[in-house]
């Protein structure tokens, strides 16, 4: 019968198994090594006996046991050869080709609990009430300093309290109106509008700083933030930023114009200056000639200045004419913080 051929890996495993079996079975001392059985010697072939005083011949030491660690290291070294080698495994993986298509989806889970539409509507109403309350609190904070006592606007019931008596259609309408408003404009932190309390006399060839203002209690007037000194007429910037400033003066001539042509240098200058230094700092200025002016006229100036925190601005009137002037009460001065 033809002998079967074992692969190299099988022979390696058999050798390691033999070594492991030898670990538990020690070779007895009386046993002779394999292949050392005495064979019959032919006549005359006996070796001569050694002399009596000669040293004894060295004997071959017999192995009584196998070290387990050496056997395991041999097994590990031999396990990477043959069919278990890394190169052969890598070549086998490359021959597998592309993976197949994904399998079918698993079974669908059980359906969740049934929630009635009434419960969903109540939860939606609660969410809508919370959103409306949050919006009202923000609007109240934004408009707390905007209204004046003279506005006399009647108090209304908050919309969040009105939701309790509204039907679902009204709730949806309120939600749509809230979303249609879009993003709100940023809050203005500093602004004012004041008027001159009484008439102010300005002598000829004089530069006069206006003061003695008051806050009008009319619809549309506003005052928000600190910094306005009504007595001195100076507005101190609470924070550094860009400020839009405006001033409008109603001016009356107190003296009758002299006979003859008016001199070209008879003019008025209206200025808004920083720290009362109109020549050194940036300022807003308007120049008006008096050649064709009437006895009562209006002069205005407006623009944007950057103010540092703690710096003040005020209104100046430069009367570069040959007659005195009167700034009428009701002339106004205003400012608003545009941004930082």
Swiss-Prot record:
Induction: Up-regulated by intracellular increase in cAMP levels, such as those elicited by forskolin and epinephrine treatments, and increase in calcium (ionomycine). Up-regulated by exercise in skeletal muscle (at protein level) and blood plasma (at protein level). Drastically down-regulated by fasting. Up-regulated in skeletal muscle by refeeding; the extent of induction by refeeding may be dependent upon the muscle fiber type, being much higher in soleus than in plantaris. Both glucose and lipid are equally potent in this induction, in the absence of any gut-derived hormones. Residues 84-95 have a biased composition (Basic residues). One of its GO terms (molecular function) is identical protein binding. Expressed in the soleus muscle in the leg (at protein level). Found in blood (at protein level). Weakly expressed in the heart (at protein level). Predominantly expressed in skeletal muscle and, at much lower levels, in other tissues, including lung, eye, smooth muscle, brain and kidney. Within skeletal muscles, higher expression levels in soleus as compared with plantaris. Expressed in osteoblasts, mature osteoclasts and erythroblasts. When fasting, females tend to have higher circulating levels than males. InterPro entries: Adipolin/Erythroferrone-rel (IPR052136), C1q_dom (IPR001073), Tumour_necrosis_fac-like_dom (IPR008983). Residues 145-154 have a biased composition (Polar residues). The keyword Cell membrane does not apply. Glycans are attached at residues 229, 281, 292, 319. Coiled coil: none annotated. The modification Hydroxyproline is found at residues 99, 101-102, 104-105, 107. Residues 30-63, 79-112, 141-161 are annotated as: Disordered. Residues 185-340 form the C1q domain. The keyword Lyase does not apply. Changing residue 273 to A: Abolishes secretion. PROSITE patterns: C1Q. Disruption phenotype: Mice are viable and fertile without any abnormal phenotypic features in normal conditions. Following hemorrhage mice show decreased hemoglobin and exhibit a delay in recovery from blood loss, rapid suppression of Hamp/hepcidin is also compromised. Loss of Epo-induced enhancement of erythropoiesis and reduction in Epo-mediated suppression of Hamp and Bmp-target gene transcription, however there is no change in baseline HAMP expression. Significantly reduced whole body, femur and tibia bone mass density (BMD) at 6 weeks and 5 months of age. Residues 1-24 form the signal peptide. N-glycosylated; required for secretion of the mature protein. It is found in: Secreted. Changing residue 292 to Q: No effect on secretion. Iron-regulatory hormone that acts as an erythroid regulator after hemorrhage: produced by erythroblasts following blood loss and mediates suppression of hepcidin (HAMP) expression in the liver, thereby promoting increased iron absorption and mobilization from stores. Promotes lipid uptake into adipocytes and hepatocytes via transcriptional up-regulation of genes involved in fatty acid uptake. Inhibits apoptosis and inflammatory response in cardiomyocytes via promotion of sphingosine-1-phosphate (S1P) and cAMP-dependent activation of AKT signaling. Homodimer; disulfide-linked. Forms trimer, hexamers and higher molecular weight oligomers. May form heteromeric complexes with C1QTNF2 and C1QTNF12 and, to a lesser extent, with C1QTNF5 and C1QTNF10. Interacts with BMP5 and BMP7; the interaction inhibits BMP-induced transcription of HAMP. Interacts with BMP6; the interaction inhibits BMP-induced transcription of HAMP. Interacts with BMP2. Interacts with heterodimers composed of BMP2 and BMP6 in vitro, the interaction inhibits the heterodimer binding to its receptor BMPR1A /ALK3 and thereby suppresses expression of HAMP. Mice with thalassemia intermedia show high levels of Erfe expression, contributing to the suppression of hepcidin and the systemic iron overload characteristic of thalassemia. May have cardiac protective functions following ischemic reperfusion injury, which are enhanced by exercise-induced expression and secretion from skeletal muscle. Erfe in the blood may act on cardiomyocytes to reduce apoptosis and macrophage inflammation following injury and therefore limit the subsequent area and amount of damage. This is Erythroferrone. It comes from Mus musculus.
């Amino acid at each position: 019968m033809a002998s079967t051929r074992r692969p190299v890996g099988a022979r390696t495993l058999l050798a390691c198994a033999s070594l492991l079996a030898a670990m538990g079975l020690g070779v007895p001392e009386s046993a002779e090594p394999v292949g050392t059985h005495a064979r019959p010697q032919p006549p005359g072939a006996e070796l001569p006996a050694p002399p009596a005083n000669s040293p004894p011949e060295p004997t071959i030491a017999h192995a009584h046991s196998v070290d387990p660690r050496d056997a395991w290291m041999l097994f590990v070294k031999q396990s990477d050869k043959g069919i278990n080698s890394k190169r052969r495994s890598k070549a086998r993986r490359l021959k597998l080709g592309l993976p197949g298509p994904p399998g079918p989806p698993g079974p669908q889970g059980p359906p969740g609990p049934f929630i009635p539409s009434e419960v969903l509507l109540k939860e939606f109403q609660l969410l809508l009430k919370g959103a409306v309350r949050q919006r009202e609190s923000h609007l109240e904070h934004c408009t707390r300093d905007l209204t004046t006592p003279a506005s006399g606007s009647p108090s209304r019931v908050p919309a969040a309290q009105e939701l309790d008596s509204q039907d679902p259609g009204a709730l949806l309408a309120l939600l749509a109106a809230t979303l249609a408003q879009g993003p709100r404009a940023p809050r203005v932190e500093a602004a004012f509008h004041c008027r001159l309390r009484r008439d102010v006399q300005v002598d000829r060839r004089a530069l006069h700083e206006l003061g003695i203002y008051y806050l009008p209690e009319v619809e549309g007037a506003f005052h928000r933030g600190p910094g306005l000194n009504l007595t001195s007429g100076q507005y101190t910037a609470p924070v550094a930023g860009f400020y839009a400033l405006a001033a409008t003066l109603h001016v009356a001539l107190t003296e009758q114009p002299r006979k003859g042509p008016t001199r070209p240098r008879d003019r008025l200058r209206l200025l808004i200056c920083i720290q009362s230094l109109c020549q050194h700092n940036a300022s807003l200025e308007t120049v008006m000639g008096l050649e064709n002016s009437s006895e009562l006229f209006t002069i205005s100036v407006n623009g944007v200045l950057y103010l540092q925190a703690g710096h003040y601005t005020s209104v100046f009137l430069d009367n570069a004419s040959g007659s005195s002037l009167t700034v009428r009460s009701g002339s106004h001065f205003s400012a608003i913080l545009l941004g930082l």
